[in-house]
Curated annotation (Swiss-Prot):
It is found in: Plastid, Chloroplast stroma; Plastid, Chloroplast thylakoid membrane. This is Cell division protein FtsZ homolog 2-1, chloroplastic. Aggregates to form a contractile ring-like structure; contraction of the ring was accompanied by an increase in the filament turnover rate. Self-interacts and binds to FTSZ1 in heteromers to form two morphologically distinct types of filaments, termed type-I (smooth filaments) and -II (rough filaments), in a GTP-dependent manner; the GDP-induced disassembly is inhibited by ARC6. Interacts (via C-terminus) with ARC6; this interaction enables ARC3 binding to FTSZ2. Part of a complex made of ARC3, ARC6, FTSZ1 and FTSZ2. Binds to MCD1 in an ARC6-dependent manner. Binds to CDP1/PARC6. The keyword Thylakoid applies. The gene is FTSZ2-1.
């Protein structure tokens, strides 16, 4: 906030007030200061202070502090020292007193953001499943995004590492903090009851990820409402949801499908992660808790794969507007994740991503592709090119592609690729078919799809037939 000096203000001391390190408007003949509106370039605010005398000692010298302590004017007006950058920003105001003594005022203002052009991204975990995914993201020290959790269960929220101010309890009157009891209608009404606080939490966002586990009460019912509020505010809204394992029961499966249909209508892009698909990624001896943790980790990788492209300065710069161009109103999307090590790690990671069990249908039909390659400091341009060849040879030549490359020293010797394929909804609607029909057709032939090589115990990578039949690459070699 800017500090203004009234034109009728007359300083009690004979010395004139001037702005530190800035030019000041001259005083009028009555000795009154004109209004001063000078912005300090470092702190982006108006500052006012006493004019330095000609014999002013050098700042930070012992003599300087000694003269300050002996100056009655500065003792009477400590705010002048604060505005000079000397001393603390806490001021005791002798003009304001209470029964307990003088009032202590803090004149320090919040500093301006270092880069006001940075896209503000928020990840909102809704319900128990969404909150668990957010908790896992925080544990992995994921940066560049702001984490929130939304729930009707106050006890579960208290166990989260999310900042207390970013824990949003909804439906206080309806649920009294006891949860939704697995009823999506209660979750939906709880979100509607708390619409104003949800809008306040979303305010100022450029992009919002709404993550939820479908099939329960709060996530299934509240996530579509929250996503709809975000989209109505003009925020790029991406939904990432998991569907329940088959062993969780038919009731949760039916509720999950209804929740997905509602969520799809309220987001720009929806990425669905079927938990049953993850069964192909684990061994038969995998504990149940580890299987659920794997689902949370897939959610984390999906969010990070997109957000890293925007927030982390990489080898290839990608603007937020580029990502918006592909993901806005994109409809249903698919995600593939691949990781590999070894001599051909980049190409293997790309193959693993396009053969991921999370991909119900091939990415050939996508109208937009967002993909990100992350490697250690030893990642080479040749490896980036090798991964790009695999992906670019497969997708439609007219598809819009966004590519990001990020160097993470923690991934030394390893390459990870996250691929988001979008635009299936628009393409299928143009052909007079629905996304659900396409997904159903893919599910009916899903048994014939070759499982991802990244999850084979042997670790070998086999080039799929559709790549063997491809001709020369459209992507230039290094």
């Amino acid at each position: 906030m800017a500090t203004y000096v009234s034109p009728c203000f007359t300083p009690s001391d004979s010395r004139l007030l001037t702005v530190l390190r800035k030019n000041v408007l001259p005083e009028n003949h009555l000795g009154r200061l004109n209004s001063i509106r000078t912005i300090d370039s470092k702190k982006n605010r108006v500052v006012v202070a006493a004019q330095k005398s000609e014999s002013s000692p050098i700042r930070n010298s012992p003599r300087h502090y000694q003269s300050q302590a002996q100056d009655p004017f500065l003792n009477l007006h400590p705010e002048i020292s604060m505005l000079r950058g000397e001393g603390t920003s806490t001021i005791v105001n002798p003009r304001k007193e209470t029964s307990s003594g003088p009032v202590v005022e803090d004149f320090e203002e919040p500093s301006a953001p270092s880069n006001y052009n940075e896209a503000r991204i928020k990840v909102i975990g809704v319900g128990g499943g969404g909150s668990n995914a957010v908790n896992r993201m925080i544990e992995s020290e994921m940066s560049g995004v702001e984490f929130w959790i939304v729930n009707t269960d106050i006890q579960a929220m208290r166990m989260s590492p999310v900042l207390p101010d970013n824990r949003l309890q909804i439906g206080k009157e309806l649920t009294r903090g006891l949860g939704a009891g697995g009823n999506p209608e209660i979750g939906m009404n709880a979100a509607r009851e708390s619409k104003e606080v949800i809008e306040e939490a979303l305010y100022g966002s450029d992009m919002v990820f709404v993550t939820a586990g479908m099939g329960g009460g709060t996530g299934t019912g509240a996530a579509p409402v929250i996503a709809g509020i975000a989209k109505a505010m003009g925020i790029l809204t991406v939904g990432i949801a998991t569907t329940p394992f088959s062993f969780e029961g038919r009731r949760r499966t039916v509720q999950a499908q209804e929740g997905l249909a509602s969520l799809r209508d309220n987001v720009d892009t929806l990425i669905v992660i079927p938990n049953d698909k993850l069964l192909t990624a684990v061994s038969q001896s995998t504990p149940v808790t580890e299987a659920f943790n794997l689902a949370d980790d897939i959610l984390r990788q999906g969010v990070r794969g997109i957000s890293d492209i925007i927030t982390i300065p990489g080898l290839v710069n990608v603007d937020f507007a580029d990502v918006r161009a592909i993901m806005a109103n994109a409809g249903s999307s698919l995600m593939g994740i691949g990781t590999a090590t070894g001599k051909s790690r980049a190409r293997d990671a790309a193959l693993n991503a396009i053969q991921s069990p999370l991909l119900d249908i091939g990415i050939e039909r996508a109208t937009g592709i967002v993909w990100n390659i992350t490697g250690g400091s030893d990642l080479t341009l040749f490896e980036v090119n090798a991964a790009a060849e695999v992906i670019y040879d497969l997708v439609d030549p007219t598809a819009n592609l966004i590519f990001g490359a990020v160097v993470d020293p923690a991934l030394s010797g390893q390459v990870s690729i996250t691929l988001i394929a979008t635009g299936f909804k628009r393409q299928e609607e143009g052909e007079g078919r629905t996304v659900q029909m396409v997904q159903a057709d893919a599910a009916s032939v899903g048994a014939t799809r070759r499982p991802s090589s990244s999850f084979r115990e042997s670790g070998s990578v086999e080039i799929p037939e559709f790549l063997k039949k491809k001709g020369s690459s459209r992507y230039p070699r290094v």
